[in-house]
């Protein structure tokens, strides 16, 4: 039995979909009763639990031998993951699969990488078999700009002229599901990227083609990005951490292209054009 933690988010919902399609036994950890009812209505078994309430986890982990976890960008994310790792070890979980990030390590040059790296190290020291799926920037993150693209034909990011090897969340999930369901992925770290590195202008061109109308990339400063993030309610510490990642784009540190997705899943990684076409309506296509 697999426990999916974070099963209502961008990556986790795809993991749930793939496991359900494969008719594999799993349950999703859910703390919100409304979301539990929604998943139950789709035939997904759920378990009540909250990473911020460790006492709720032992019951949810009953009968579970594999765990997949992805957590949101929140101030207490390290503690949330740590609580699950401790509970999983105590429950006798055999294989712990975690979505982290490219370059995640305790000595990463960026804060988010260090946060994720701390939990990776905890899993490695736990005695459980582990697999880390380490994505770069998600294509789905562009959906947060969909309204601006529809209304103004523009999106704003602090990437300069740098290129990013955007990855589709569906491919991140596919790698995770392979790790959960097929042998040979134990104790492996899988950095995953899309099949091509694109500049902001190239992303805009792909969105234009999908939407059937002009879309323009507007490069903004890190300070402008911070103001936008904190203006939407993000804590300043997290906005600063995100800006550390964005700052890696102009020197093309985010432009590396790896073949992990086809090697692990047996199918090519999705292109940005495929993603844009799949979400054309969100970006303003008639």
UniProtKB/Swiss-Prot annotation:
Keyword Membrane annotated: no
Temperature impact on function: Optimum temperature is 41 degrees Celsius.
Keywords, in A-Z order: NAD, NADP, Oxidoreductase
Positions of NADP(+) binding: 6-11, 31, 136-141
UniProt keyword Glycoprotein present: no
Activity sensitivity to pH: Optimum pH is 6.2-6.8.
Domain of life where this protein originates: Bacteria
Pfam families xref list: NmrA
GO molecular function: oxidoreductase activity
Known EC number: 1.7.-.-
Regions crossing the membrane: none
Role of this protein: Catalyzes the reductive cleavage of azo bond in aromatic azo compounds to the corresponding amines. Uses preferentially NADPH rather than NADH as an electron donor for its activity. The enzyme reductively cleaved Orange II and carboxy-Orange II, and can also reduce several sulfonated structural analogs, which carry a hydroxy group in the 2 position of the naphthol ring.
Annotated PANTHER family: PRESTALK A DIFFERENTIATION PROTEIN A (PTHR43162:SF1), PTHR43162
Family under the similarity heading: Belongs to the NmrA-type oxidoreductase family. Azoreductase type 3 subfamily.
Oligomer and partners: Monomer.
Protein name: NAD(P)H azoreductase
Organism from which the protein derives: Xenophilus azovorans
Upper classification of the organism: Bacteria, Pseudomonadati, Pseudomonadota, Betaproteobacteria, Burkholderiales
């Amino acid at each position: 039995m697999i426990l999916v933690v974070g099963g209502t988010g961008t990556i986790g919902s795809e993991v749930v979909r793939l496991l359900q399609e494969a008719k594999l036994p799993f349950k999703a950890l859910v703390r919100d009763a409304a979301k539990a009812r929604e998943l139950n209505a789709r035939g997904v078994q759920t378990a009540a639990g909250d990473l911020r309430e460790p006492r709720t986890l032992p019951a949810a982990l009953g009968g579970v031998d594999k765990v997949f976890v992805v957590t949101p960008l929140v101030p207490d994310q390290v503690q949330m993951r740590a609580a699950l790792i401790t509970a999983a070890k105590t429950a006798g979980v055999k294989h712990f699969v975690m979505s982290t990030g490219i370059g995640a390590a305790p000595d990463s040059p960026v804060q988010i990488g260090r946060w994720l790296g701390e939990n990776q190290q905890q899993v490695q020291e736990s005695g459980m078999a582990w697999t880390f799926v380490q994505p770069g920037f998600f294509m789905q993150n562009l959906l947060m700009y969909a309204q601006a693209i529809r209304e103004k034909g523009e999106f704003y990011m602090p990437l300069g002229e740098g290129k990013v090897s955007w990855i589709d969340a569906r491919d991140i999930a596919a790698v995770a599901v392979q790790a959960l369901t097929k042998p040979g992925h134990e104790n492996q770290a899988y950095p995953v990227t899309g099949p091509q590195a694109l500049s902001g202008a190239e992303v805009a061109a792909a969105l234009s083609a999908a939407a059937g109308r002009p879309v323009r990339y507007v490069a903004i400063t890190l300070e402008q990005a911070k103001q936008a993030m904190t203006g939407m309610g993000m804590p300043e510490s997290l906005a600063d951490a995100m800006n550390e990642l964005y700052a890696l784009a102009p020197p093309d540190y985010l432009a590396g292209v790896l073949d992990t997705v086809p090697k692990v899943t047996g199918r090519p990684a999705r292109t940005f054009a495929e993603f844009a076409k799949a979400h054309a309506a969100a970006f303003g296509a008639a």
